[in-house]
């Protein structure tokens, strides 16, 4: 399997499966002298780890990170940063009864089509658990970007068709669901309880806002900043759509409504989401990701086995009702990895 590395200069390569001994990665290209410790990475991992809140899986993982290389006396050395996270609460026997049956909405059938063999335990490499390594990588990128006065906020704006407002994005990391709207939380909780009682799952929408991005990042045509951000977020398994700025609403707007007018103080609006012609404008870079419902539901579903025989499946095991609260730190991490890479690309080009 290829495709396990993200980035051109600031690179993260990840490894591991949902029910294997552990997961981890190697970060190449991180400059020397960046303050970094296991505690700094752990803070971000704790925001993603399973077993928290009413929407999360019952699987309990401490997700304790161990830095293996590339850090000395609390600072990066400029060499490869290796890290590892153990799996401690996997229950592979939960999948033994469905090992030869394709789960609707999962990558079982496509992995078989490509490789002719697959790890049926929770999806193996295609599991959402793979994203723990991305968050560790994003934590390193965040420390690098902090030196550039660049910060990133990520927050939930919709769950199960119920919209919240962007009222307090700076407090989202303190609130349930990483909500930017405290008032919508009770409605989301009720919706999750309702759907859980039906044996079903929910999706939603996450917004990522990157502040302090200097003008000039991105390359025209095939290496645009917004194109790379969309690629980064779409690489997360549950994401099915990405918008930059006004996004799909721009298709229904007039040019006079969508254009961001300018005056002596700069831009008067930000429908472009901080990117024009694939290059950052100096405004906040705003991206939204549309996340599908978790496909592991306890309702009976029609499917086929590996031999093509029709059958019915009812998925047991431990699964999220809604992945949104745990995917927020993942999307934030992918955005930071992207911007960190572009900062270093810009430096290389002078």
UniProtKB/Swiss-Prot annotation:
Keywords carried by this UniProt record: Amino-acid biosynthesis, Aromatic amino acid biosynthesis, FAD, Flavoprotein, FMN, Lyase, NADP
Keyword Lyase: yes
Residues annotated for NADP(+) binding in this entry: 48
Cellular component aspect of the GO annotation: cytosol
EC code: 4.2.3.5
NCBIfam families linked to this entry: aroC, PRK05382.1
Subunit structure: Homotetramer.
Function: This reaction introduces a second double bond into the aromatic ring system.
Protein name per its UniProtKB record: Chorismate synthase
Naturally occurring in which organism (per UniProt): Maridesulfovibrio salexigens (strain ATCC 14822 / DSM 2638 / NCIMB 8403 / VKM B-1763)
Source lineage: Bacteria, Pseudomonadati, Thermodesulfobacteriota, Desulfovibrionia, Desulfovibrionales
């Amino acid at each position: 399997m290829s495709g396990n590395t993200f980035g051109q200069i600031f690179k993260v390569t990840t490894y591991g499966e949902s029910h294997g001994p552990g997961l981890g990665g190697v970060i190449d290209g991180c400059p020397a002298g960046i303050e970094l410790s296991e505690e700094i990475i752990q803070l971000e991992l704790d925001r993603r780890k399973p077993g928290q809140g009413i929407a999360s899986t019952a699987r309990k993982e401490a997700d304790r990170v161990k830095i293996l290389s590339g850090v000395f006396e609390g600072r990066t050395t400029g060499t490869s940063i290796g890290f590892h996270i153990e799996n401690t609460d996997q229950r592979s026997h939960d999948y033994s009864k469905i090992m030869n049956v394709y789960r609707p909405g999962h990558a079982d059938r496509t992995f078989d089509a490509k490789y002719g063999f697959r790890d049926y335990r929770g999806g193996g490499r295609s599991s959402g658990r793979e994203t723990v390594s991305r968050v560790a990588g994003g934590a390193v990128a965040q420390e690098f970007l902090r030196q550039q006065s660049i910060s990133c906020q990520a927050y939930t704006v919709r769950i199960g068709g119920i919209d919240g407002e962007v009222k307090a994005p700076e407090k989202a990391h303190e609130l349930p669901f990483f909500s930017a709207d405290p008032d919508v939380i009770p409605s989301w909780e009720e919706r999750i309880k309702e759907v859980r009682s039906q044996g079903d799952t929910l999706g939603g929408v996450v917004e990522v806002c990157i502040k302090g991005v200097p003008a000039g990042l991105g390359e025209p045509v095939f290496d645009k900043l917004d194109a790379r951000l969309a690629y980064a977020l779409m690489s997360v398994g549950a994401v099915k759509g990405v918008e930059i700025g006004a996004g799909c609403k721009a298709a229904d707007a007039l040019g006079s409504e969508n254009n961001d007018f300018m005056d002596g103080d700069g831009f008067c609006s930000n429908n472009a989401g901080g990117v024009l012609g694939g290059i950052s404008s100096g405004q906040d870079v705003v991206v939204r990701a549309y996340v599908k419902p978790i496909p592991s539901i306890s309702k009976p579903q029609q499917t086929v086995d590996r031999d093509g025989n029709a059958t019915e499946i009812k998925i047991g095991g431990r699964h999220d009702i809604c992945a949104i609260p745990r995917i927020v730190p993942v999307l934030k991490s992918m955005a930071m990895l992207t911007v960190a890479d572009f900062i270093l690309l810009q430096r290389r080009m002078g």
